[in-house]
Regions:
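Short glycine-enriched loops at secondary-structure junctions
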Residues: 7-10, 113, 119, 165-170
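Active-site nucleotide/adenylate-binding loops and adjacent lid/helix of ATP-dependent enzymes
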Residues: 8-91, 101, 142
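Generic beta-strand structural signal
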Residues: 33, 108-109, 166
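Short, solvent-exposed loop/turn elements at beta->coil junctions and helix N-caps
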Residues: 38, 94-97, 163-165
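Phosphate-binding site of ATP-dependent enzymes
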Residues: 65-152
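Conserved metal-phosphate-binding beta-hairpin within the catalytic cores
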Residues: 152-174
């Protein structure tokens, strides 16, 4: 184990990570949590589409699903209601970011960004290497370094992979 227990706990849970990033004024996609299917549907009715639904705990892009319309959302929510996992009852929704077909993975040690790569996907909105996205070296800009240092401090430091997206209007978001 490299990172402290609390850092591993926070970074392994999107809900906890999102709350700490928001608390520390770090730009992120708009994020909505619901703890029941009815509350998730209410959020979707208020916010609209497209959104992305993600598992609170998970990696490699598994079960990350774009919700482009009400029919898709209803089907996914219904499926999650009948599964046995209690974490499936936490509906973690994020706005769909208008971005190039890539994201940026920055590796930090403490508050220092040490390396970065673009993760490019030509056929999916998911940019996970495990799902076939192609890595490409990315030069670390001052903006990236500053944002990653703030994100690292917000979650307690350690050795982290900070994922950045290039929002066409807002700039970099975590």
């Amino acid at each position: 184990v490299i990172n402290k227990f609390n850092v591993s706990t926070i970074c392994g849970n999107k809900l906890l990570t999102s709350m700490l990033l928001k608390k520390n004024n770090i730009p992120t996609p708009k994020t909505y949590f619901s703890f029941s299917a009815d509350a998730a549907r209410e959020n979707l009715d208020k916010v609209g589409y497209p959104l992305v639904i993600k598992p609170v705990i998970g990696s490699w892009g598994r079960n990350v699903i774009p919700l482009k319309d009400k029919d898709t959302a209803d089907a996914i929510i219904e499926q999650r209601e009948i599964t046995d996992g209690p974490l499936d009852r936490i509906f973690y929704l994020q706005e769909m970011i208008d971005r190039p077909p890539r994201d940026i993975r920055v590796i930090t040690i403490g508050d220092k960004a040490v390396t970065a790569m673009y993760r490019k996907s030509s056929d999916s909105f998911k940019t996970n290497i495990a799902l076939g996205a192609e890595p490409e070296i990315c030069d670390i800009t001052n903006e990236m370094e500053d944002l990653c240092a703030k994100a690292s401090k917000a979650v307690g430091g350690g050795i982290l992979g900070v994922d950045l997206m290039e929002d066409k209007e807002k700039g970099l978001v975590v």
